[in-house]
C-alpha cells in the first residue's frame, strides 16, 4: 500500500499501524500515524511510537469497542479521557520525552493535519 500511496504525493494518515514490516516505507512518505491502545503491548505499534518523527503522531481510541478489544477488558465511556492520557504517557516514555511534550506534539500534529 505504501508503494501505491507514494505515487500520489498525498499526506497520509496511517491508522493503527500494526505490521512488523514496511514501517520504513510509511516513514519515507512523511506520514502521520495514529496510536491506539495497542501502544501498551503491540511491538509494531510501540515501534511506531518510538520512530515516527516529531509532530507526526496522533493519539486515538478508534472507539470504545476497539479499545475493549485491544485491552481485553470493558472500557466504560467515562474512562476515555484517562485512556487517552495513559496512551500519551506511554508514547512519551517510548520516545524519551515528557508527557507534556508528547501532548504538545500530538496537538501540533492534529493542528497541522487538520488546519486547526
Predicted regions and their residues:
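Catalytic pocket-lining loop regions of alpha/beta-barrel enzymes
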Residues: 1-58
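Short acidic/histidine-rich active-site segments
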Residues: 55-77
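Mid-to-C-terminal alpha-helical segments outside catalytic/metal-binding sites
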Residues: 81-116
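Residues at secondary-structure transition points
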Residues: 43, 75-82
Amino acid at each position: 500500500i505504501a508503494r501505491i500511496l507514494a505515487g500520489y504525493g498525498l499526506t497520509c494518515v496511517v491508522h493503527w499501524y500494526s505490521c512488523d514490516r514496511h514501517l520504513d516505507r510509511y516513514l519515507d512518505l512523511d506520514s502521520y500515524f495514529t496510536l491506539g491502545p495497542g501502544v501498551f503491548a503491540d511491538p509494531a505499534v510501540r515501534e511506531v511510537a518510538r520512530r515516527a518523527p516529531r509532530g507526526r503522531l496522533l493519539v486515538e481510541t478508534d472507539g470504545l469497542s476497539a479499545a475493549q478489544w485491544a485491552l481485553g477488558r470493558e472500557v466504560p465511556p467515562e474512562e476515555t479521557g484517562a485512556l487517552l492520557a495513559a496512551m500519551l504517557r506511554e508514547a512519551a516514555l517510548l520516545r524519551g520525552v515528557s508527557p507534556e511534550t508528547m501532548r504538545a506534539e500530538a496537538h501540533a500534529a492534529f493542528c497541522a493535519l487538520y488546519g486547526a
